[in-house]
């Protein structure tokens, strides 16, 4: 049987094993450590099976295609902005004719994607290969990055400052603190940067990075957003009441408490029928979620809804019914939901922090204060002043064009061409040859 045929049979075996992961999906999304251990064991079995059968990845079978481009991401999570970016880049590279694959320590069971492998299957790399290294938190790739002969391109998504987690999540606080130390310590091992925002570029420069750093936003396949939103959600909440929405993981740096406080002020003074939808995954036992429940009680806010873990088409439905997108986050490396709100023509009111002004690029409404009454006044103007609202949406539509798939695709491919050329120059220098003019 030819190698590609063996690979096809092997992929089916892996797919069958992946079905066993599905039954663990709910608990996995809740970050159950025991369950993650079970999944790692299953993935180890896949690795052992691969070795036993003598299989080779498609990536290895294309070893003669130069350059091969691999992406490293600590974990490939379902619905995660970093994972989505890695998958979108993979599809883009495949479409451009590159031999490419993603290597990771763990893959979410909902992700059924070819050429995604456990890191144990990483083949030997050469100076002709290119690594795109996604970084958002401490991971186990540092030794590989520091020792590889391949060209290393850092796709930096930023690390949440650990102080945000203090008092809420000790584990996250430790991981993020180690992550900041780790990323700073790898500055001499990185050859090139393609970061997702100017804020992230400045962050690396402040850490002492001296390699060339380009900015290319997260690659968003907007065709995915054209599917039909969840009809039940749209029908239930299209009743004439004002729907305020924020989308993001329920974590402290997103400052959900400030969203709730501003909503409560708006509801009390301007619109008693308004509702607030806080769309993001959480566990009811999380200390931060419990804190938010206390905030809601203290504010006396009613109609605050946490939809919880929902399907993608349901997330689209909440964007569809949104009258205003309210973001009070204090740390973002990019903030994809802002672009999603633009796509759904929802006016944005956002606190001017970190990467948010850069992502909005002069669109939306930036507020410099979190004083609830002042933010509520801005919200009310957006809702009541038709001309003002129309101007906001017009600027958001213009800004959205900057994130067009083909535009960002071109930017990333251009940067990869530069990396490829710099790699050839590097090899020539190592061989003592003169560079061509």
Where are each of the predicted segments found?
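Short hydrophobic beta-strand element within catalytic cores of glycosyltransferases
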Residues: 338, 347-350
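Nucleotide-activated donor-binding/catalytic signature segment of Leloir-type glycosyltransferases, i.e.
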Residues: 289-313
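Conserved donor-binding/catalytic core segment of Leloir-type glycosyltransferases
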Residues: 194, 235-254, 260-263, 277
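Conserved acidic donor-binding segment of nucleotide-sugar-dependent glycosyltransferases
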Residues: 365-372, 381-386
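Glycosyltransferase donor-sugar binding loop
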Residues: 104-108, 273-290
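Donor nucleotide-sugar binding/catalytic pocket of nucleotide-sugar-dependent glycosyltransferases
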Residues: 187-229
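Short alpha-helical donor nucleotide-sugar binding micro-motif in glycosyltransferases
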Residues: 309, 317-322
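Aromatic "clamp/platform" in nucleotide-sugar-dependent glycosyltransferases that forms part
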Residues: 330
């Amino acid at each position: 049987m030819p190698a590609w045929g063996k690979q096809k049979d092997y992929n089916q075996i892996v797919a069958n094993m992946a079905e066993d992961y599905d039954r663990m999906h709910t608990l996995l999304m809740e970050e159950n450590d025991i369950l993650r251990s079970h999944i790692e064991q299953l993935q180890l079995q896949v690795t052992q099976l691969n070795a036993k059968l003598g299989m080779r990845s498609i990536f290895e079978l294309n070893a003669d295609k130069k350059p091969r481009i691999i992406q490293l991401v600590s974990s490939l999570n379902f619905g995660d902005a970093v994972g989505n970016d890695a998958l979108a880049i993979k599809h883009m590279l495949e479409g451009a004719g590159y031999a490419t694959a993603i290597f990771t320590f763990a893959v979410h069971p909902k992700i059924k994607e070819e050429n995604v492998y456990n890191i144990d299957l990483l083949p030997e790399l050469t100076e002709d290969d290119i690594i795109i290294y996604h970084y958002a938190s401490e991971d186990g790739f540092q030794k590989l990055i520091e020792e590889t002969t391949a060209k290393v391109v850092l796709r930096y998504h930023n690390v949440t400052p650990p102080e945000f987690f203090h008092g809420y999540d000790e584990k996250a606080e430790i991981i993020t603190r180690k992550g900041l130390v780790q990323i700073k310590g790898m500055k001499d091992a990185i050859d090139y940067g393609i970061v997702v925002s100017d804020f992230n570029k400045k962050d690396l420069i402040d850490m002492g990075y001296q390699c060339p750093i380009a900015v290319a936003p997260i690659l968003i396949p907007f065709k995915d957003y054209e599917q039909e939103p969840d009809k039940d959600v749209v029908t239930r909440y299209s009743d004439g009441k004002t729907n305020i929405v924020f989308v993001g993981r329920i974590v402290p740096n997103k400052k959900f408490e400030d969203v709730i406080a501003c909503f409560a002020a708006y509801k009390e003074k301007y619109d008693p029928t308004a509702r607030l939808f806080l769309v993001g995954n959480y566990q009811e036992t999380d200390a931060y979620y419990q804190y938010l429940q206390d905030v809601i009680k203290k504010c006396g806010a009613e109609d605050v809804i946490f939809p919880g873990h929902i399907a993608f088409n349901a997330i689209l439905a909440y964007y569809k019914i949104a009258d205003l997108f309210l973001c009070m986050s204090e740390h973002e490396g990019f903030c994809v939901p802002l672009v999603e709100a633009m796509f759904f023509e929802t006016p944005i009111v956002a606190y001017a922090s970190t990467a948010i002004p850069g992502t909005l690029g002069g669109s939306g409404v930036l507020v410099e204060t979190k004083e609830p009454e002042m933010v509520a006044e801005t919200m009310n103007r957006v809702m009541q002043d038709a001309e003002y609202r129309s101007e906001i949406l017009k600027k958001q539509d213009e800004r959205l064009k900057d994130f067009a798939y083909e535009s960002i695709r071109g930017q990333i491919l251009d940067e990869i061409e530069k990396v490829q050329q710099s790699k050839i120059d590097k090899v020539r220098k190592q061989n003592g040859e003169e560079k061509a003019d």
